[in-house]
From Swiss-Prot:
GO terms for molecular function: proton-transporting ATP synthase activity, rotational mechanism. F-type ATPases have 2 components, F(1) - the catalytic core - and F(0) - the membrane proton channel. F(1) has five subunits: alpha(3), beta(3), gamma(1), delta(1), epsilon(1). F(0) has three main subunits: a(1), b(2) and c(10-14). The alpha and beta chains form an alternating ring which encloses part of the gamma chain. F(1) is attached to F(0) by a central stalk formed by the gamma and epsilon chains, while a peripheral stalk is formed by the delta and b chains. Its main location: membrane. It comes from the Bacteria. F(1)F(0) ATP synthase produces ATP from ADP in the presence of a proton or sodium gradient. F-type ATPases consist of two structural domains, F(1) containing the extramembraneous catalytic core and F(0) containing the membrane proton channel, linked together by a central stalk and a peripheral stalk. During catalysis, ATP synthesis in the catalytic domain of F(1) is coupled via a rotary mechanism of the central stalk subunits to proton translocation. This is ATP synthase subunit delta. Keywords: ATP synthesis, Cell inner membrane, Cell membrane, CF(1), Hydrogen ion transport, Ion transport, Membrane, Transport. NCBIfam families: ATP_synt_delta. Pfam families: OSCP. The gene is atpH. InterPro entries: ATPase_OSCP/d_CS, ATPase_OSCP/dsu. Belongs to the ATPase delta chain family.
Amino acid sequence: MQQYIAGRYAQSLYAVCGPRLESDANKFLGLLSENNFLSFAKVKTSTKLHVLDRLHLPCELKNLCKLLLANHRGFLCTTVLLGYIEIVKKNRKEADARVESYSRLSATAKKEVADALLIKFPYLKKINIAQKVNRSILGGLTIKINSIMIDLSIAGRLAKCKSIGQSTILEIFQ
């Protein structure tokens, strides 16, 4: 339910401002990741409003936070801003891909992965690669883009072979 409510606020913010608040929203999210004072129930609303007034934020962003606080939903601010940024990226036909590999990828390899994903997903114009090193995959890559998972890892291939082997053995003995 909270995700739905936050999504409605994010859509409203995008309808009013379009993509022009994206950089300010990212900066404010960085600040909230260090100290999400808007979600603290023990901090008075008047104190939160005073802090918001002191921050150099666009008036639309301040008004959104004030509205959330007035409706006792200050804890949704981070979720709303993340939803807004997702809407902006979606309208620019941009996506984030999380790539896990055994070792760090070079810039050339990242570009090749992004280019291959652009071919696989022609409706996208840009793919941002976020890389994570994961030694448990033994080699290869796993790619997660939106809700799609592409497993090109050795560990994934071994698990698939093991599954096929087990099902074959079960068929033999039945």
